[in-house]
Amino acid sequence: MARVGILLLNLGGPERIQDVGPFLYNLFADPEIIRLPNPILQKPLAWLISTLRSSKSQEAYRSIGGGSPLRRITEQQARELQSLLRQRGVDATSYVAMRYWHPFTESAVADIKADGIDEVVVLPLYPHFSISTSGSSFRELQRLRQMDERFEALPLRCIRSWYDHPGYVRSMAELIAEQVRASDDVEHAHIFFSAHGVPKSYVEEAGDPYQQEIEACAALIMAELETIVGHSNPHTLAYQSRVGPVEWLKPYTEEALEELGRAKTQDLVVVPISFVSEHIETLEEIDIEYRELATESGVVNFRRVRALDTYPPFISGLADLVVASLEGPEVNLDQAAELPTTVKLYPQEKWEWGWNNSSEVWNGRLAMIGFSAFLLELISGHGPLHAVGLL
């Protein structure tokens, strides 16, 4: 029997306060998170932003106990998935590959090779594909395969996204139903889906299917919820965690909550739709910041649906995905990371940016001026980036 490795991809998170700065640096150094036309600026900008945001982020992590629970939860998900697959007759071993903190992808790949795995199923713990989540992890795996002949020779099957998988949809609907039934007015409880946002340009210029998959997923969950509770409920989909002055997917969670507050919403059931584990964005951003905002805006009862974590039907759904991947047609890394052929990933060709040799010189000069302005604002603690909330 072939030995199968299940490679679970996730974001990662700082486990201690002192890890916050390095974690943020790794995050912002990824060109899929901050897209710049000149890659030479990526690391200096990542250092600058992580330095400026570190203190605020540390306070957020202190409010949830001093660190992220993401690694602990993801490793528990991995153990339970491994156990269930072995019960189903699959000789599976699970591995966790975090993108921006330990255990890093390189570590998971080293363990896979050391264990003599015959075949790998790559399963992102992101139900919805995005350039900045699954896409970034897929491209990191592509980079590692190009550098390692042994890893490159290992058969890899990828699961690109699974937002419409019945096991996931049903699990989400069941957990939402728990909070709907606890509401004072079950038929009018307002379901509020809060998804992690991405810049609008990712969707409109780079062809990211994220928004389409999120919207389709919310519709599927609402239909399943209706079969469980026996009635339809009003719902809203909004996007959280916006950073910086650029336009992100709308409506923004903050603005949508304020609007529902003005409407004197009695029962609000908040659903972290793009998160399968408790972490900083559920425990601090939703449970503390958004709860306070909603209450101040006029929402009477704020209920948050728990993350899937190790909910048994959810783990069973993940096992179904793995088995289907092993039995179905192979989806390789290139196919999993692919975007529509009509668009290009950044950076585009020079002529599409209007560049020539002369303009590149000026672009470089302007970039240095801009970076100098960043440093000046870092030293002074004042400036336009502080004013708009980026720093």
UniProtKB/Swiss-Prot annotation:
Localization: Cytoplasm
Enzyme kind, highest EC tier: lyase
Catalytic function, reaction form: heme b + 2 H(+) = protoporphyrin IX + Fe(2+)
Keyword check for Lyase: yes
Domain of life, per lineage: Bacteria
GO MF: ferrochelatase activity; metal ion binding
Principal place of residence: cytoplasm
Enzyme Commission numbers on file: 4.98.1.1
Keywords: Cytoplasm, Heme biosynthesis, Iron, Lyase, Metal-binding, Porphyrin biosynthesis
Gene3D superfamilies for the chain: 3.40.50.1400
Listed name of the protein: Ferrochelatase
